[in-house]
């Protein structure tokens, strides 16, 4: 929804799982409009969703998410229009646990703590300019920014004290962060030289920044009152990996006659990262024949290339 250019209206909905808000209307009547929407789970406003506790222990859990979407649409003329958009979404989960025990006179105490936090989310911003050259040709020019982030941290601690002096203690904490950030610019043309031909062509540039992982951990161990270990480990990949991708494409949807149509196209791309370049040519061809009475026969050939892959390990 790009926003109503004539009047203001909106809605606020309280649901069992999510609450929603939507507002839209004109900024400059018949020229500029806006649209804003937001969604959240009600647990966003609670510190803890589930609490289980008694005199010696407590377990606390919570999960929430939210996302917001804002758009502005401006009409310069009947041939020129610009669209601006912003999106942000985030999910969060946390768990906290605590246990403690002591003897009858509190001279001996034992307690343990455990907590973990997991966050992930996306941020997207883009602007698109639509320009109509004539009745046969128009163009969309788009600039965008996309960022994904994930973070995980947690710690655990077990402590045993006698007469308020620590005899045994084990502490472990860890943090992990990763993310992907893309900047891109593209131009897409739509050309109809005659009724039988519908041609699309364009170009795109993407700058990738990958942060595969930044991990740190700390271990502290006390045994019989003596420090056995106090170490910080850093397995960070502090150097971001960058890649640049350039691509060109063209395709033609050709209606040969009332029953037979062809779609032929090609995409060529170049990916450069860490001093190396990778090139690919990706042709495609499809044909469709209308058999009548709602039936058709189709055949196609496509060659595609993917430069970035997700590698994951599966425990046996």
Predicted regions and their residues:
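Predominantly transmembrane beta-strands of Gram-negative outer membrane beta-barrel pores used
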Residues: 1-2, 8-59, 64-75, 83-87
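Flexible, surface-exposed loop regions and adjacent strand-edge segments
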Residues: 51-56, 89, 98-112, 156-170, ...
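Short, well-structured beta-strand segments within conserved domains
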Residues: 32, 80, 197-199, 285, ...
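Transmembrane beta-strand segments that form the barrel wall of outer-membrane beta-barrel proteins
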Residues: 6-17, 38-41, 261-272, 281, ...
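Membrane-embedded beta-strand positions of outer-membrane beta-barrel proteins
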Residues: 10-14, 34-38, 84-86, 141-143, ...
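Surface-exposed extracellular loop regions of Gram-negative outer-membrane beta-barrel proteins
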Residues: 92, 103, 149, 289, ...
């Amino acid at each position: 929804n790009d926003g109503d250019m004539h009047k203001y209206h909106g809605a606020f909905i309280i649901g069992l799982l999510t609450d929603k808000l939507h507002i839209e209307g004109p900024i400059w009547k018949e020229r500029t409009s806006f649209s804003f929407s937001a969604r959240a789970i009600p647990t966003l406003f609670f510190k803890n969703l589930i609490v289980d506790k008694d005199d010696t222990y407590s377990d606390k859990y919570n999960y929430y998410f939210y996302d917001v979407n804002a758009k502005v649409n401006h009409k310069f003329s009947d041939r020129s229009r610009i669209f601006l958009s912003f999106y942000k979404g985030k999910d969060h989960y946390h768990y906290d646990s605590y246990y403690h025990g002591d003897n009858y006179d509190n001279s001996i105490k034992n307690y343990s703590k455990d907590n973990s936090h997991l966050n992930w989310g996306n941020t997207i911003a883009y602007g698109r300019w639509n320009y109509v050259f004539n009745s046969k040709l128009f163009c969309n020019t788009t600039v965008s920014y996309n960022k994904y982030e994930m973070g995980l941290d947690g710690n655990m601690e077990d402590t045993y004290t006698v007469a308020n002096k620590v005899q045994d203690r084990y502490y472990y904490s860890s943090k992990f962060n990763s993310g992907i950030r893309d900047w891109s610019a593209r131009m897409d043309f739509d050309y109809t030289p005659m009724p039988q031909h519908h041609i699309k062509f364009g170009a795109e540039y993407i700058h990738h920044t990958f942060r595969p992982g930044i991990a740190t951990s700390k271990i502290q161990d006390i045994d019989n009152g003596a420090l056995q270990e106090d170490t910080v480990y850093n397995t960070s990949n502090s150097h971001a990996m960058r890649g640049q991708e350039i691509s060109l494409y063209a395709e033609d949807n050709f209606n040969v006659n009332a029953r037979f149509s062809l779609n032929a196209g090609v995409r060529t791309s170049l990916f450069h990262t860490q001093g190396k370049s990778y090139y690919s040519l990706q042709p495609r061809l499809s044909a469709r024949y209308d058999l009548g009475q709602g039936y058709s026969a189709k055949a196609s050939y496509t060659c595609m290339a993917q430069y970035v892959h997700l590698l994951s390990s599966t425990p046996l």
